[in-house]
């Protein structure tokens, strides 16, 4: 069922770009840049494409076959800028190499300042807290903090890393968090920080969030120290609604959130900028150990693709895909990471079958 996509040949200066045409109808097609990425990326991206074909989503895919070991090309940046929307698999970052993370490179090049990760339990999956509803959203400042990439060796054996926090970036992410809460019927925003120790950097972030909170009196505002936040997430995650964080803390908290709802394969996410948005899994795990073995869980990227469809105004298609994914999980078709025995293709096939049986 995954082989039903029709290839469209277009002139290109790079053989790393492929174009696929999804379902064709009277509806104007939308073009989306796709980066399958490394590890399990190509498998879960293929899953999304197969599901979209079955759901008759009017999308044309512009695919860039790049790896985390390759530089980000200007052609890729131009594609995302032109299309304004991209779907991305995980990109591998070598731990001890001197090269910059390609994920960071994309965020900086496109000014993707907000990383949004909804963490919500899915019926049919055994989670860490079955007695309470886990349903919170992590909104992470995506361009500064410890991820500024400003590191240097001062002398052999001594290195320095600069943490950059600005009022402008803090205002932007805080306002985004409150606007997100307002638009999505959320009641509370919690700022996560370490201002008790990092009094200047995190102090500025917290002070700015506190200032912006005054513009939204209808939304409750709290703040919490990052170490206590991690403990409380494990202990009582139901107390959180929307969390706004500096860069590093958001990475940590969103991974905890993914674990709380069942694992890294279950959370979708988006990197949001003023001009472009990249949708991807909420937890960026390449999972090289299972790559190519038909064991990957495509749920996280499927849920990210649902977010993408809603952003594009394709709400009926979004509902169709989301309902199918949740129905298949509830019926017990699960991949091995969440206690099942289904392969990637079997899970994807079950989602496609559900869509085709319930097609209007």
Curated annotation (Swiss-Prot):
The gene is idhB. This is Isocitrate dehydrogenase [NAD] regulatory subunit B, mitochondrial. Keywords: Magnesium, Manganese, Metal-binding, Mitochondrion, NAD, Oxidoreductase, Transit peptide, Tricarboxylic acid cycle. It comes from Dictyostelium discoideum. PROSITE patterns: IDH_IMDH. The record marks 147, 194 as: Critical for catalysis. Heterooligomer of catalytic and regulatory subunits. Performs an essential role in the oxidative function of the citric acid cycle. It is found in: Mitochondrion. It is an enzyme of class 1 (oxidoreductase).
């Amino acid at each position: 069922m995954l082989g039903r996509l029709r290839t469209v040949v277009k002139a290109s200066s790079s053989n790393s770009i492929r174009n696929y045409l999804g379902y064709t109808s009277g509806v104007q097609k939308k073009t989306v840049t796709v980066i399958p990425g490394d590890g399990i990326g190509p498998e879960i991206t293929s899953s999304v494409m197969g599901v979209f074909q079955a759901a008759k989503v009017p999308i044309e895919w512009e695919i860039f076959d790049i790896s985390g070991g390759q530089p980000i090309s200007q052609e890729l940046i131009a594609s995302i800028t032109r299309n304004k929307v991209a779907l991305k698999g995980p990109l591998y970052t070598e731990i001890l190499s001197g090269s910059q993370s390609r994920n960071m490179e994309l965020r900086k090049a496109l000014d993707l300042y907000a990383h949004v990760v909804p963490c919500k339990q899915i019926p049919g999956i055994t989670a860490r807290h079955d007695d309470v509803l886990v349903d919170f959203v992590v909104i992470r400042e995506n361009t500064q903090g410890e991820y500024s990439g400003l590191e240097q060796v001062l002398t052999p054996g001594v290195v320095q890393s600069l943490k950059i926090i600005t009022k402008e970036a803090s205002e932007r992410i805080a306002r985004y968090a409150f606007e997100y809460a307002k638009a999505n019927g959320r009641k509370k925003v919690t700022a996560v920080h370490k201002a008790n120790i990092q009094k200047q950097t995190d102090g500025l972030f917290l002070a700015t969030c506190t200032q912006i909170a005054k513009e939204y009196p209808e939304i409750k505002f709290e703040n919490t120290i990052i170490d206590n936040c991690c403990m409380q997430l494990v202990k009582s995650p139901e107390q959180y609604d929307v969390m706004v964080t500096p860069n590093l803390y958001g990475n940590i908290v969103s991974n905890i959130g993914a674990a709380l709802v069942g694992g890294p394969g279950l959370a979708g996410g988006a990197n949001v900028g003023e001009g472009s948005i990249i949708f991807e899994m909420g937890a960026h795990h390449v999972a090289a150990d299972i790559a190519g073995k038909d064991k990957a869980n495509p749920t996280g990227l499927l849920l990210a693709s649902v977010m993408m469809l809603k952003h594009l105004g394709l709400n009926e298609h979004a509902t169709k895909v989301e309902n199918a994914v949740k129905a298949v999980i509830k019926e017990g078709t699960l991949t091995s990471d969440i206690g099942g025995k289904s392969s990637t293709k079997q899970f994807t096939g079950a989602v496609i079958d559900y869509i085709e049986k319930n097609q209007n």
